[in-house]
Amino acid sequence: MLAVQDLEIRIGARLLMSGVNFRVDKGDKIGLVGRNGAGKTTLTKILAGENPPSAGTIDRQGEIGYLPQDPRTGDPEELARTRILNARGLGDLMVKMTQATEDMGSIEEAIFDRGMKNYSRYEDEFQSAGGYAAEAEAAAIASNLGIKESILSQPLKTLSGGQRRRIELARILFSNANTMILDEPTNHLDADSVIWLRDFLKSYTGGLIVISHDVDLIGETVNRVFYLDAMRTVIDVYN
């Protein structure tokens, strides 16, 4: 949930918007539209907590999944698969389970015993977090976004910008976030993946704010449109 009160946004001396008030509750799906330079991306960065507003308050409750245009977060050494699974705390557990399995193959009794003990503990935590069913769900999301198995096995630092963006989108969709803020989520997706994403967002029950030049995605997934005009400092709302 997001509650915005008396929001003001400036870039240098330029006033983009002021006196902005709105809420995003469960089931609210908002499309941000307007010409380039109207402040759509700037607004989403502020709503997500990436940048502060010039004035006003934003109350954020629950988990927020934010897809920027150029994702840079995450450990560059982390595998793409681990990045996605860690949205629910599963990725690091799988790494620990793998290490415990390797320890269980040791001929040294102390290392073997440590591996047995650790594997049992980590697997219990893994299952409590959704386990193999959640892992399969993450794999299905990745596949539907056109992410190949070979990409999932690579560290983030080796991925192209488009691949990195799809990994981040998959992570957010897998996260069960209460509110999603997506800046041009169809970028770098093929036609089949775009259709799948539309269906996913239509069935999503949380709050959604999306910037997109995909008219069909906006038309099929949102129930309110916020129009930003670079020449005015207000947001026009259409249901």
Question: What is each model feature region?
Answer:
Residues 1-239:
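ABC ATP-binding cassette signature C-motif
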